Amino acid sequence: MNNSTNSSNNGLAITSPYKTFEVVFIVLVAGSLSLVTIIGNILVMVSIKVNRHLQTVNNYFLFSLACADLIIGVFSMNLYTLYTVIGYWPLGPVVCDLWLALDYVVSNASVMNLLIISFDRYFCVTKPLTYPVKRTTKMAGMMIAAAWVLSFILWAPAILFWQFIVGVRTVEDGECYIQFFSNAAVTFGTAIAAFYLPVIIMTVLYWHISRASKSRIKKEKKEPVANQDPVSPSLVQGRIVKPNNNNMPGGDGGLEHNKIQNGKAPRDGVTENCVQGEEKESSNDSTSVSAVASNMRDDEITQDENTVSTSLGHSRDDNSKQTCIKIVTKAQKGDVCTPTSTTVELVGSSGQNGDEKQNIVARKIVKMTKQPAKKKPPPSREKKVTRTILAILLAFIITWAPYNVMVLINTFCAPCIPNTVWTIGYWLCYINSTINPACYALCNATFKKTFKHLLMCHYKNIGATR
């Protein structure tokens, strides 16, 4: 940072390049931005901690990003404001180098976290069958650690030890900037590695993500008939499984569980882990049926056998105390997250009257599953996650591009960049840390609701907010 300095002067009015009212204005604005950044990123971190619906792999990456942004809000913004309004660096060369190392390592960690988020979403969309198996909390932790370690290796040694590498410290007293920025090769190398290359990669990844998402939505829209046809009786099995208490094998208590989907094992939960950051919604009719059946009261059960066209196999055993009703429905194409089977257990019914009531419940379930399935809406959760990534990516490019362009220009022509323009460009990088929490809230309803509960001190049931 090439601020005009005069370390021999002690008065603010003499050393500061700004007038008194300008200093007050800068301090108020910078202090407000710092406070908003701190509060916003603390809200993100606390929201993920207290709300179990936000404790997803994707949001763990956002948690790491919020940690980096919080450090920027606490240290980087305030020290740079001090440096700006006073007009010189008052804390000595050691603190200067430590501040610069922390500032650039944390800022680059933000970039690396954005890169990880983009890669994570890309693999979720392009490899929905294989990637979720590897997408574990442990893997996320390793990726986050790698982002921070790489950022440290890229910036900290060069900032802290460059003066020893070249044999002299060229940064004058009262100034604080990275010494190797005067070296064109090193400046270009770090700028490309820290900004330009990640931006290119993230842009390409987002283009592929967007194209894959649009292709999936178009494919679903082309199949309205398959989504609206009634479920065929051959694909609906209502089975009453009555375990014999005298011959119950170990393990599952004698209940029979068969998962059938056109002769293949169902693809349960294949991509559900990849659609993170949003509330999980149930869109399968058999799931709704199981909820209705489990909540039925005896007085709600009426014998309406004429409405059932599917026969139900059953066996009688007065000693049995469990009934298992299993519904297997045909999974919709393109909806690999929807369960293909639902098991409903009715406990406590025995004897002939109990069997009759259970049979009636089974018939009602089969009747409900035979109703025409509602057309599944477009995958809004997937669109919201993609939209969040787009918002974060655009905010990053807009706020970081001016400074990184000026860094390259400064290598060849330092006087070409006015001090005020440099300061604004530097501050724009910091403002990105202020914007990120707003991106989460605007693009993610669960984050937004949790933020609201925390700010209004409504802690009841906050852990289950959707």
UniProtKB/Swiss-Prot annotation:
PROSITE patterns: G_PROTEIN_RECEP_F1_1, G_PROTEIN_RECEP_F1_2. Residues 1-22, 81-97, 163-184, 411-418 are extracellular. GO terms for cellular component: asymmetric synapse; axon terminus; cholinergic synapse; dendrite; glutamatergic synapse; membrane; neuronal cell body; plasma membrane. Phosphorylated in response to agonist treatment. Residues 218-289 are annotated as: Disordered. Its main location: membrane. Keywords: Cell membrane, Disulfide bond, G-protein coupled receptor, Glycoprotein, Membrane, Phosphoprotein, Postsynaptic cell membrane, Receptor, Synapse, Transducer, Transmembrane, Transmembrane helix. The modification Phosphoserine is found at residue 232. It is a multi-pass membrane protein. Disulfide bonds join 96-176, 413-416. It is found in: Cell membrane; Postsynaptic cell membrane. A motif (Important for signaling) lies at residues 120-122, 436-440. Residues 46-59, 120-139, 210-387, 443-466 are cytoplasmic. The chain crosses the membrane at residues 23-45, 60-80, 98-119, 140-162, 185-209, 388-410, 419-442. One of its GO terms (biological process) is chemical synaptic transmission. One of its GO terms (molecular function) is arrestin family protein binding. Residues 254-270 have a biased composition (Basic and acidic residues). InterPro entries: GPCR_Rhodpsn, GPCR_Rhodpsn_7TM, Musac_Ach_M2_rcpt, Musac_Ach_rcpt. Belongs to the G-protein coupled receptor 1 family. Muscarinic acetylcholine receptor subfamily. CHRM2 sub-subfamily. Interacts with ARRB1 and ARRB2. Interacts with RACK1; the interaction regulates CHRM2 internalization. This is Muscarinic acetylcholine receptor M2. It comes from Rattus norvegicus (Rat). The gene is Chrm2.
